[in-house]
Curated annotation (Swiss-Prot):
InterPro entries, sorted: LysoPLipid__transptr_LplT, MFS, MFS_trans_sf
Lineage, opening ranks: Bacteria, Pseudomonadati, Pseudomonadota, Gammaproteobacteria, Enterobacterales
Major place of residence: membrane
Gene transcribed to yield this protein: lplT
GO cellular component: plasma membrane
Natural source organism: Escherichia coli O7:K1 (strain IAI39 / ExPEC)
The protein's name in its UniProt record: Lysophospholipid transporter LplT
Membrane topology: Multi-pass membrane protein
Cytoplasmic side: 39-52, 112-144, 188-226, 278-280, 326-343, 388-397
Periplasmic-side segments: 1-17, 74-90, 166, 248-256, 302-304, 365-366
Residues passing through the membrane, by range: 18-38, 53-73, 91-111, 145-165, 167-187, 227-247, 257-277, 281-301, 305-325, 344-364, 367-387
Length: 397
């Protein structure tokens, strides 16, 4: 392990490769674990409305620890923070394997994910700079989406075979991520020596929130990414209930195949964004965001598998093109104002608050008996209107 604080800014440096591998394995575990645990809930006869609650306890950890994880990422070598966070994920997955309440185990994975996220994105600005940052984000998103693709499918397919095997595979993936983190160069902490008083940390985090919100560009990025990821997570759970109703298929694997189509599309869209969008032309991504909602609405009305695959892949392409430039904009502007770790922590608060709100509304809609197809139609229409409003606001300001 290198102790050097100097970095090779190449996109394919040793450190960047280690980050990408660690991110792939960690995200693979996250996505496989979601579908494996959903299969466990079905096997143990939990009610349908409890499924989004599983994700809500996960994102609740992000929100609870949001004031602190950004400072953790900036106060220590980010590679070591990533290793510790993946260790927590490993512990959470293993606890579910050994029969601990799945909601408690998944909460522990959420704590690890909360600590991991500011470090994984913040380290990109330390390993590469300038014009390569958007491309580095493209690599990170491509790695993440490839992991979503393979992890989601693996979780569903293995769960159809045996739930315990699926859960064990998740723990193994997290263990591999811990090992990959060892090979990330130990870089100097970005902002060492900060106070660890919880009150002052909370106050500092709120100051970072205020600073980013007052800046028009970072506020635009925060709202856009929050809407996107809140909608993306809700779509995942919508698919779990939509498949048996619209397609008449009741296995665990088919919703994961459909999620995989979104993942493939996001890889394509992220690559296109890296080539076609710069920090100076971020507004080019906005039409894609509006079209996401329109295509979700059309998708909800389908009753055949092949059109569903095609439309979900299109949703992914539009999503990748939409979110990658917004992520890069926030990292670049945030690094200069509040530090990359704090910027990503604020972003996580926004995104996970949106997820919590959207999942809560979705769970409530399912609980009161609204059919899943009308839920999907309303969901797509509201998302398109929200992104349209954001674009109008951005152009005026």
């Amino acid at each position: 392990m290198s102790e050097s604080v100097h970095t090779n800014t190449s996109l394919w440096s040793k450190g960047m490769k280690a980050v990408i591998v660690a991110q792939f394995l960690s995200a693979f575990g996250d996505n496989a674990l979601l579908f494996a645990t959903l299969a466990l809930l079905k096997a143990q006869f939990y009610p349908e409305w409890s499924q989004p609650i599983l994700q809500m306890v996960f994102v609740g950890a992000y929100i609870l620890f949001a004031p602190f994880v950004g400072q953790v990422a900036d106060s220590f070598a980010k590679g070591r923070v990533m290793m510790f966070a993946n260790g927590l994920k490993l512990l959470g997955a293993a606890s579910i394997c050994f029969g601990i309440n799945p909601f408690l185990g998944y909460t522990l994975v959420g704590v690890g994910a909360a600590a991991y996220s500011p470090a994984k994105y913040g380290i990109l600005g330390e390993l590469t700079t300038g014009s390569k940052l958007v491309k580095a984000n493209g690599l990170m998103e491509a790695s993440t989406i490839a992991a979503i693709l393979l992890g989601s499918v693996a979780g569903g397919v293995l769960a159809d075979w045996h739930v315990l095997v699926a859960l064990a595979a998740c723990a193994l993936a997290y263990g591999g991520a811990v090992v990959a983190n060892i090979y990330i160069p130990k870089l100097a902490a970005a902002r060492p020596g900060q106070s660890w008083n919880l009150i002052s940390m909370t106050r500092s985090f709120l100051n970072a929130c205020t600073s980013l919100w007052r800046n028009g560009e970072t506020r635009f990025s925060l709202v856009g990414t929050s809407l996107f990821w809140g909608a993306g997570v809700t779509l995942r759970f919508l698919l779990v209930l939509w498949v048996p109703v619209a397609l008449g298929i009741t296995d665990n694997a088919t919703p994961t195949y459909l999620n995989a189509m979104v993942a493939i599309g996001i890889v394509v869209g992220a690559g296109a964004a890296a080539k076609l969008v710069t920090l100076e032309t971020v507004s080019r991504c906005m039409p894609a965001g509006i079209l996401i909602g329109v295509v979700v609405l059309i998708f909800s009305l389908q009753h055949e598998l092949l059109p569903a695959y095609a439309l979900l892949m299109l949703i992914g392409v539009l999503g990748g093109f939409f979110v990658v430039p917004l992520n890069a904009l926030l990292q670049e502007r945030g690094k200069k104002s509040v530090g990359a770790g704090n910027a990503i922590a604020v972003q996580n608060l926004g995104e996970n608050s949106a997820m919590l709100l959207m999942l809560g509304i979705y769970s409530l809609a399912v609980m009161v008996g609204i059919p899943v197809v009308p839920i999907g139609i309303g969901f797509g229409a509201l998302f398109a209107l929200a992104i349209t409003a954001l674009w109008i606001w951005q152009r005026r300001h």
